[in-house]
């Protein structure tokens, strides 16, 4: 299988060299790498240029004055700048990696084995670990059956079926829901760990709550589903304020009829899927 890896980069000079080294040392070699420098203001560009100058499977695309500030949209836009810089349809597997990720040497070897053994797998990845003290521990911001945004691997046919990545907050959950809609399997290799050098930022609680409400709107939840989902999240957070802000955000977006990046058919599937998942959990 021929792999194309696209890595959006913004001000990663502190980590990028270690990450590049781990990419270059992959035991699986049928990989092309494209780094997309999204107008970095540090010396990320120079570090990348120096590293890749004698490595023909690595390429660099530079974006000038990127001005997209919509959460979620910026990274997807940067990803597409790299993807569309080549004829990506000649590849079998498409990957979006963050620029602060260190891969174990056999990462893509194990990924390819799984894809070859099971043609139904559409999205696959390992688990993301962060450093706490002297130990690497699971970055516990999603369940262990979810392929995280920093390490997305898509079978090309699945990527095409889901209409690629959507430029919206929540793109990295939407892709998985749409893959299920098109009868693709999603697999997490729980014995395969990657190191996340710059843990996912913890924003102010109010911003986090607003983003959750926006995410529920973006993926097409109904008012009832959003109410239950916001309530469940606020129960976990032990915060009534979290519920009020997230649900209020959802309602205000619904009132202004903000445009979504999904079709009615996709929305109907997502609502049905979420209800079914909720009922399954309730029955346990």
What does each model-identified segment do?
Residues 76-93:
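Active-site nucleotide-sugar/metal-binding loop of Leloir-type enzymes
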């Amino acid at each position: 299988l021929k792999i194309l890896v696209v890595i959006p980069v913004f001000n990663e000079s502190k980590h990028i060299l270690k990450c590049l080294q781990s990419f270059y040392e992959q035991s699986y070699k049928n990989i092309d790498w494209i780094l997309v420098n999204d107008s970095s203001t540090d010396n990320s560009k120079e570090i990348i240029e120096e590293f890749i100058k004698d490595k023909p499977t690595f390429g660099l695309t530079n974006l000038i004055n990127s001005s997209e500030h919509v959460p979620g949209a910026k990274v997807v836009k940067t990803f597409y700048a790299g993807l569309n810089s080549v004829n990506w349809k000649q590849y079998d597997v498409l990957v979006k990696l963050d620029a602060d990720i260190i891969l174990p040497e056999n990462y893509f070897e194990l990924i390819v084995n799984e894809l070859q053994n099971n043609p139904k797998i559409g999205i696959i990845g390992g688990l993301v670990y962060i450093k706490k003290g002297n130990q690497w521990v699971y970055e516990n911001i999603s369940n262990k059956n979810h392929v995280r945004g920093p390490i997305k691997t898509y079978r090309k046919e699945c990527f095409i079926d889901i209409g690629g990545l959507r430029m919206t907050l929540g793109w990295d959950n939407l892709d998985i829901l749409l893959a299920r809609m098109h009868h693709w399997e999603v697999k997490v290799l729980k014995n395969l760990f990657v190191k996340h050098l710059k843990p996912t930022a913890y924003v102010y609680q109010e911003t986090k709550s607003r983003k959750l409400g926006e995410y529920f709107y973006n993926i097409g939840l109904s008012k009832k589903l959003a109410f239950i989902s916001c309530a469940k999240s606020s129960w976990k957070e032990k915060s009534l304020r979290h519920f009020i802000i997230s649900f209020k955000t959802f309602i205000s977006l619904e009132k202004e009829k903000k445009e979504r990046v999904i079709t009615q058919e996709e929305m109907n599937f997502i609502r049905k899927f979420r209800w079914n998942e909720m009922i399954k959990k309730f029955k346990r």
